[in-house]
């Protein structure tokens, strides 16, 4: 790591010669494999942007020239080159480096949300601010790729960027061959129009030999132009779209040829106006296990053996795999069930449904808003759509859920993976807002399974509902030990435990456990009986609307405690409190929930412990309440 060790700021890159730059790129790839193998993280995307990121920091003057990485999971090389290489052993660990750009870490990091398709809007606003300040010298650079251009927000931003003819905005499209689906949206239509033009055949015939002589970039470009009609993924962007927007276009550029990268970026740096630079890169570049992973190119990994790329520990069946299996069973029985993903078929468990029912599966790209309204259209046509997305990405589609699905009472089922605390991916990946958001949609019904069996049951129940939207939410991670109910009330509420104290006149506590929080609720219940209280633990299963039996049970107890993994305002505790007020039930109630703040990255167990949401923390809190309410 001789050259890498000499790099502490971007300025150190500017004096390197060609030989040094090639060596540095190799050192960075070795460094990435070694470090990410030990912590887990986004390996493939970062291996693909080594030369590109070196070029960005050689040509532009960060942070005076802001460099914004869309999604920012591909910002590891940027972190390395801006003085943070020494901290990579702590990547995605508590109190360590974030897996995304982070304003608290460095002045070179301008943003930190890991939601896609936002970088161009940030760049548009930053460039306007510079213009208002009279700064006509510095550029604003936005690096966008990995499918982000399938998000509508990018095109809204491009429309505005293009209108600023004298604003120096550099849009770097990192095209790694995995980003664009020709069967979706205007890309395919645009090239189809190009193909119909008289010059197209002449161009392709004359260009075939010269393109293929350009090496892998030329071959991929030629093949991609023909691939659209066949529905194959392509690396080429319909380049005539950008001049029509009023933007200069440069490319395609070999994103692994440092000299070519630098030259293209220098041209963009000197250009007085908005410009697109199209870089063709290879995700997973230089690491054989990633290059051989044809499905994902090691987009994201856990802890792995750096030599083989194999996981250090075997993964256990999780919530997503149970959902995946059950949805296929349901799909086999009901041909009206269809599935929708926003560019995440594998991570959300829909790949198996796609394999079994390809005509009933729809990948809409990174477009959650469109996904939900398209689902409403499918429902209007007599289908029952299941939209599987990460909970955090529901935030973008809330208006569509509220107005396009909810107001029309359409039977759309949203399956929210990674609900609650997600941990190491940090603040913007936590799914702690979904209960507060969905609960305000009139007519929506929300379910929170506690284990594998209840997930299967609730998914079937949700899809059987045909008079309005349903939501099934479950967390990240391994499945808990199954919990068998000892009783089920009329409206489906499961009673999980009755824990009696030794005293005959002991106060009674009702614990309402939401979803997989049932496991910790049972542990807490067994502990607090030692403090002289009787405890009943229930799992509502359907948490929105509040089951009426919870109101009756609350009236029969001396204290009601809700335990959930969403934010404290607007969650089940708030909803139950409202229901008790409406029924004039004055039983004291308390909430155990996620605080109303953005959570730092750490493991799920560390986050729960930090905020008093593990068994020890909850016990301490509850005992304090008991002493306050019932102590002598």
Swiss-Prot record:
Binds 1 Mg(2+) ion per subunit. It is an enzyme of class 2 (transferase). It catalyses: D-glyceraldehyde 3-phosphate + pyruvate + H(+) = 1-deoxy-D-xylulose 5-phosphate + CO2. One of its GO terms (biological process) is isopentenyl diphosphate biosynthetic process, methylerythritol 4-phosphate pathway. GO terms for molecular function: 1-deoxy-D-xylulose-5-phosphate synthase activity; magnesium ion binding; thiamine pyrophosphate binding. Pathway: Metabolic intermediate biosynthesis; 1-deoxy-D-xylulose 5-phosphate biosynthesis; 1-deoxy-D-xylulose 5-phosphate from D-glyceraldehyde 3-phosphate and pyruvate: step 1/1. Thiamine diphosphate binds at residues 73, 114-116, 147-148, 176, 287, 368. It comes from the Bacteria. Catalyzes the acyloin condensation reaction between C atoms 2 and 3 of pyruvate and glyceraldehyde 3-phosphate to yield 1-deoxy-D-xylulose-5-phosphate (DXP). Belongs to the transketolase family. DXPS subfamily. This is 1-deoxy-D-xylulose-5-phosphate synthase. It comes from Corynebacterium glutamicum (strain R).
